[in-house]
A protein has these predicted regions:
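Carbohydrate-binding surface patches
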Residues: 463-509, 514, 541
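Noncatalytic carbohydrate-binding groove/subsite architecture in carbohydrate-active enzymes
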Residues: 196, 203-210, 237-395, 401
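Conserved, mostly hydrophobic/aromatic
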Residues: 105, 192, 224, 248, ...
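C-terminal beta-strand-rich structural cap/linker in extracellular carbohydrate-active enzymes
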Residues: 523-548
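N-terminal substrate-binding region of glycoside hydrolase catalytic domains
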Residues: 77-232, 236, 276-278, 320-322, ...
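Ser/Thr-rich, Pro/Gly/Ala-heavy low-complexity intrinsically disordered linkers and tails
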Residues: 11-80
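Bacterial N-terminal signal peptides that target proteins for export
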Residues: 1-9
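Aromatic/acidic polysaccharide-binding cleft in carbohydrate-active enzymes
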Residues: 365-446, 460-466
Length: 548
């Protein structure tokens, strides 16, 4: 779905920047304006609600209850540590310093940006620092900058280049279900994997504009996504997409030549299928739309590939918790059953595509009340605070379902309220406002990742109070662990003095409250009594860290 952006940027957008999952769409911002330091404390978007006083923090009261037993309730645990699990959608113009604290970066990357030669079909020369127009974009520096800050980034190549007539499907003289129809797309995927992947290729196979540095094997990108919501506006069916994926993956098992596909360029590279939207409004359920698409992709692959395998390394989905319709607000992850929906996709993967991780690469909430995807104000908590609460709870639902990566949409707002454009879904879903000022959600996500960076999800723990949710984590770098505790309600509920049992031989514990204005939260020492600590539990998740 194409859309216009502010300033003069639309002139170079040849394909959709972001295809929303329902109705009208607003895409990623290109205005920058983010702060320069990951731990800078600029004025927070949302005013007073961004402060610590807006959230019910952890208390240091003591009490007693039976000890926890982490179980498998809520789905299979993913193996990813939190530093590689959580991430954000962004653009090259976004500040690396603002991206890095959130984690993995999914970079929207229009196919048309990669070449401007309209007369050299089907293989235009590739650009990595485009000169038309002269915005000075440099993807080499972008991905290396993320890597230097300990964060991985990957491009989501989307839309179509102008030299293929702005069509996502093959030209009229090509068969939509023939991998050979996508040789130009597979060639592009080869070129970017050759440059940013880990394997150097022969200089003679590089297709570059004359002003581009001749480089390969830079080792800054491992994953390469080959579309965005192909089942939405682009109109791909599963079999059609499987044909393109076969070209993008390994040049249709090498049949398309020695310079087609990411695996041909770098055997270590991973191809991520474009994130599926689930065709909102089609009459199908989201889960059945996803599985029907994957069924068709698998059927095509069984008939056309000798390995009989759908050519992707990752199962990739998008889901947003829309409410029943404007002006109703969006739904919390618990009210919308997000965990069960994602778990159904994971179960399908387990049965039909074992070994391929499931990623959830778009989810989010707007903060402007005119949007059909807006987080509501609840009690004393503003929409800005509730956005942050629900995003963390979305991450917890994904972990419980067995999802291995989750990237929130998106870093920046694309409009400033009360402009009418803000009534469009996704326009105010950013973690930063248009001024570059972080919302509470940015701080919540940064704290979640910073505090649990080396931790893996273990499972849920049965709670002793109604509506209290408890998730348990283990530290891969030590013998300690963590709980995350929250109310799974959407009415500003608080359970005071909740008794949380700690594992045997725990000697120290501390609570970390997610708070606007602080990228690592507010830490409070807890004193265990008979192996138990107490804390007030609110709808803002609280992290409890413990160690022997």
């Amino acid at each position: 779905v194409a859309f216009s952006l502010r300033s003069l940027i639309p002139l170079v957008f040849f394909g959709a920047m972001h295809c929303g999952s329902s109705g009208a769409n607003a895409g990623p911002s290109l205005d920058g304006g983010a702060t320069d330091s990951a731990h800078a404390q600029p004025p927070s978007e949302g005013g007073a609600e961004a402060s610590a006083s807006s959230d019910a923090g952890a208390s240091t009261e003591t009490g007693a209850r039976d000890g926890p037993m982490a179980d498998s309730e809520g789905g299979a645990a993913g193996a990813a540590t939190i530093d590689t699990f959580v991430g954000v959608n962004a653009l090259i113009t976004d500040s690396v310093a603002n991206l890095a604290p959130i984690g993995v970066v999914r970079e929207y990357h229009n196919w048309g940006w990669l070449g401007n030669n309209f007369n050299d079909l089907p293989y235009p020369q590739t650009l990595y620092t485009p000169d038309i127009p002269s915005f000075g974009w440099d993807w080499d520096s972008f991905f290396s900058g993320l890597q230097a800050m300990g964060v991985s980034g990957f491009p989501a190549v989307q839309g179509a280049a102008p030299w293929v007539n702005n069509s996502a499907v093959p030209p009229a003289d090509g068969s939509p279900t023939a991998a050979a129809s996508y040789i130009a797309h597979g060639d592009t995927m080869f070129q970017i994997a050759a440059r940013w992947g880990k394997t150097k290729v022969a200089d003679s196979v590089l297709k570059l504009e004359s002003d581009q540095a001749r480089k390969s094997g830079l080792g800054t990108v491992e994953y390469f996504e080959d579309y965005n919501e192909e089942d939405n506006a682009a109109g791909f069916t599963g079999d059609v997409f499987a044909a393109m994926a076969s070209a993008d993956y390994d040049g249709d098992e090498g049949r398309l030549g020695a310079t087609i596909g990411v695996k041909t360029a770098d055997p270590n590279a991973k191809l991520v299928m474009g994130g599926l939207s689930g065709r909102y409004g089609s009459g199908d359920t989201w889960v059945s739309s996803i599985t029907t698409f994957l069924d068709a992709a698998r059927t095509w692959s069984a008939a056309h590939r000798t390995d009989a395998t759908f050519a992707t390394d990752v199962v990739n989905v998008h889901y947003y918790s829309f409410g029943p319709g404007a002006p109703a607000p969006a739904l919390s992850p618990e009210a919308d059953g997000v965990e069960a929906k994602l778990a159904a996709v994971v179960s399908y993967r387990d049965q039909h595509m074992p070994g391929k991780p499931v990623w959830w690469t778009e989810f989010g909430y707007d903060t402007f009340g005119g949007s059909p995807l807006h987080a509501p104000a609840l009690g004393s908590n503003s929409a800005f605070v509730v956005q942050g609460q629900w995003l963390i709870r979305e991450l917890l639902a994904a972990l419980a379902a067995g999802v291995e990566r989750a990237t929130v949409f998106e870093l920046d707002d694309t409009c400033a309220p009360p402009a009418s454009a803000c009534n469009t879904q996704f326009a105010t879903a950013g973690l930063l406002g248009m001024s570059g000022s972080p919302k509470p959600a940015w701080y919540y996500l940064a704290t979640f990742r910073a505090r649990l960076s080396s931790y893996t999800y273990v499972g849920t723990v049965p709670a002793t109070e109604a509506n209290v949710r408890v998730a348990q984590f283990a530290d891969t770098k030590g013998s300690g662990g963590a709980f995350v505790v929250w109310m799974g309600t959407s009415n500003a509920s608080v359970t005071p003095g909740y008794a949380l049992s700690l594992p045997a031989r725990t000697s120290t514990a501390k609570a970390v409250a997610l708070t606007g204005g602080l990228a690592t939260g507010i830490e409070t020492t807890l004193t265990p009594s008979a192996g138990v600590v107490t804390l007030d539990v609110s709808e803002t998740p609280t992290i409890v860290l413990y160690s022997p």
